[in-house]
C-alpha cells in the first residue's frame, strides 16, 4: 500500500510541474534552433535545392558529434556553460540548457529526414511556378512534411522527458531529483513507484495526443 504524507505529496506535485516546465520550454527552444538547422542540412545536401558541400559537411559533423555524446556526459561537460547562461547549475531552469543542446542535433536530423520524404514532384511543381527559396520552404516543404514533423516532435518530447529524469543525478530538479533523493538515497519504494508511474502516464499522454495530431494533419 502506498502511503505518502502531505509534504511528500506537495514535493511530488512540484516535481511534476518542474518536469512539464523543463520539457515544454526545452522543446520550444530546441525547435527554434533545430528546425532551421534541419532545413539547412536538407537544402545544402548533395543533389538537393541549394547544394553546398562545405556548409553541409561542417554542420553535419557538428550535429553528429553532439548526437554521439551520452546525455549524462554532456550534462557534466556543459556545467560551466550552464552556469554562464542561467547563473547556476542546479534546478529545473539550469537543466533546460543541456536538454536543448542535446536535443537540437536530434531534431535537426529528424527535420532533415522528414523533408527528404516530400515528393520531388511537388517541389518541382513549385519551382516551375517561380517559387523563391523562402516560399519553397515555408509554403511547400514544411507543410508537406507536417505529419512526419509531428511524429518527430512526439519522439523528441519523449526523449527529452527521459533526459530530464537523468538530470536528477546532478540536482536538475523535477522527477529525476525526487527519485534520486527520496527513492534511491532513502530507499523509499513508494516514491520510486509513484515517480515511475507518473513518467509512464506523461509519456503515454504525449504519445497518444501527439499521434492523434499527426493523423489529423495528415491529408495524404
Q: What residue spans do the PLM features occupy?
A:
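Short helix-to-coil transition segments within interhelical loops
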Residues: 115-145, 185
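Cytoplasmic-entry segments and transmembrane alpha-helices of multi-pass inner-membrane transporters
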Residues: 40-77, 99, 104, 110-113
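Transmembrane alpha-helix signature in integral membrane proteins
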Residues: 12-43
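Glycine-rich helix-loop "coupling/hinge" segments at transmembrane-helix boundaries
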Residues: 163-193, 197-198, 218
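C-terminal transmembrane helix and the adjacent membrane-cytosol boundary/short C-terminal tail
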Residues: 40-46, 192-220
Amino acid at each position: 500500500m502506498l502511503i505518502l504524507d502531505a509534504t511528500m505529496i506537495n514535493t511530488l506535485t512540484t516535481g511534476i510541474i518542474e518536469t512539464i516546465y523543463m520539457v515544454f520550454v526545452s522543446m520550444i527552444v530546441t525547435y527554434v534552433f533545430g528546425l532551421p538547422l534541419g532545413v539547412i542540412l536538407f537544402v545544402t545536401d548533395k543533389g538537393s535545392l541549394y547544394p553546398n558541400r562545405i556548409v553541409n559537411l561542417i554542420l553535419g559533423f557538428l550535429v553528429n558529434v553532439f548526437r554521439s555524446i551520452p546525455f549524462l556526459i554532456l550534462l557534466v561537460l556543459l556545467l560551466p556553460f550552464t552556469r554562464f547562461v542561467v547563473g547556476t547549475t542546479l534546478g529545473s531552469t539550469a537543466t533546460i540548457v543541456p536538454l536543448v543542446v542535446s536535443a537540437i542535433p536530434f531534431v535537426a536530423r529528424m527535420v532533415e529526414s522528414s523533408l527528404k520524404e516530400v515528393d520531388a514532384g511537388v517541389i518541382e511543381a513549385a519551382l516551375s511556378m517561380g517559387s523563391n527559396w523562402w516560399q519553397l520552404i515555408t509554403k511547400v516543404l514544411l507543410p508537406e512534411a507536417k505529419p512526419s514533423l509531428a511524429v518527430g516532435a512526439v519522439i523528441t518530447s519523449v526523449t527529452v522527458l527521459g533526459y530530464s529524469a537523468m538530470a536528477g543525478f546532478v540536482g536538475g530538479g523535477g522527477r529525476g531529483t525526487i527519485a534520486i533523493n527520496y527513492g534511491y538515497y532513502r530507499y523509499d519504494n513508494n516514491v520510486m513507484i509513484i515517480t515511475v508511474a507518473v513518467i509512464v502516464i506523461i509519456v503515454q499522454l504525449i504519445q497518444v495526443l501527439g499521434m492523434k495530431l499527426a493523423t489529423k494533419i495528415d491529408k495524404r
